Amino acid sequence: MPGPLLKTLQGENISRRPIWLMRQAGRYLPEYRELRAEKGGFLALVYDTDAAAEVTVQPIRRFGFDGAILFSDILIVPYAMGQDLQFLAGEGPHLSPRLLDAALNSLVAVPGRLSPIYETVAKVKAQLSPETTLLGFAGSPWTVATYMVAGEGSRDHHDTRALAYRDPSAFQAIIDAITEVTIEYLSGQVEAGAEGLQLFDSWSGSLAPAEFERWVIAPNARIASAMQQRYPHVPVIGFPKGAGEKLSAYARETGVNAVGVDETIDPLWAARELPANMPVQGNLDPLLLLSGGPELERQTIRVLEAFADRPHVFNLGHGIGQHTPIENVEALLKIVRGWSR
């Protein structure tokens, strides 16, 4: 029998509001920091399937969230496509060769780099109760492309946007390649035990409306369609962070089952503008969770009330901050669990 999170993502408006938090497996947890120190680098932790499974389950064990999300990274896809991936202390991820300097067809795919991720999914699934939904995920093509082209994160994605304008056919080939690998990657996660999927388009907010249609909506629609044809029982959550008013078109045109809302969007606007009865996920500001206090309770209740008339998964507007106090997460859970329509 599906748990409350899966029921909600499938379109049921149930009395108990399910909750999980983006980056819930991470540095704010002392048990995570201990294991990370033991394993060394971030990528080593991701590829140690026992350790990655343990990290995925840690927040479930501590807080009893309704969903466990796979501990991994969106850049596993370009790593499998043949780029070298390094996480440097204080600098973030680096990919090479960057596609500003090398042709896409020069990359030699290493599909075996995906297999350990599937093993982690299976190991997590074996540890969860039926009530806890296991979510897999991938980065959406635009966001992944920004790293593949520039070789690292950037503030305004200047290099990637310029390439898309200068040579749209070459950039389309990059988007298409990422899309195809992502479909297979997500399929592997479902086959290993994932019950729902999230597409993270973390940098969608850097695009103008026409480019948003081409580089965000279109490839996400291809992925959602492929997954629904293969696995109609597995809901897909689309999260185009920073989309703003373009979120409404995203929700209507991509075919995702549920849509994630970031903290910059008024929940009352989202409740009014998004398709009726479409499951929504979000959208508490992570800084409120960091700060705690009466304002945390007030704003949490505001989100709960705004989405009371549709299926809603309580979450943050983006990932939990590493300095968030454990007691604030416990307080949030108490508020959400204690609230009733």
UniProtKB/Swiss-Prot annotation:
Gene Ontology cellular-component terms listed: cytosol
Pathway of action: Porphyrin-containing compound metabolism; protoporphyrin-IX biosynthesis; coproporphyrinogen-III from 5-aminolevulinate: step 4/4
Site-annotated residues for Transition state stabilizer: D73
This protein's encoding gene: hemE
Record keywords: Cytoplasm, Decarboxylase, Lyase, Porphyrin biosynthesis
Species name: Novosphingobium aromaticivorans (strain ATCC 700278 / DSM 12444 / CCUG 56034 / CIP 105152 / NBRC 16084 / F199)
Identification of the protein by name: Uroporphyrinogen decarboxylase
Catalytic activity: uroporphyrinogen III + 4 H(+) = coproporphyrinogen III + 4 CO2
GO MF: uroporphyrinogen decarboxylase activity
Origin superkingdom: Bacteria
Its EC number(s): 4.1.1.37
PROSITE patterns for this protein: UROD_1, UROD_2
Biological role stated in the UniProt entry: Catalyzes the decarboxylation of four acetate groups of uroporphyrinogen-III to yield coproporphyrinogen-III.
Binding site for substrate: R23, Q24, A25, G26, R27, D73, Y147, S202, H318
Assembly information from the UniProt record: Homodimer.
UniProt cross-references to InterPro entries, sorted A to Z: UROD/MetE-like_sf (IPR038071), Uroporphyrinogen_deCO2ase_HemE (IPR006361), Uroporphyrinogen_deCOase (IPR000257)
UniProt main location, coarse: cytoplasm
Pfam families found in the cross-reference section: URO-D (PF01208)
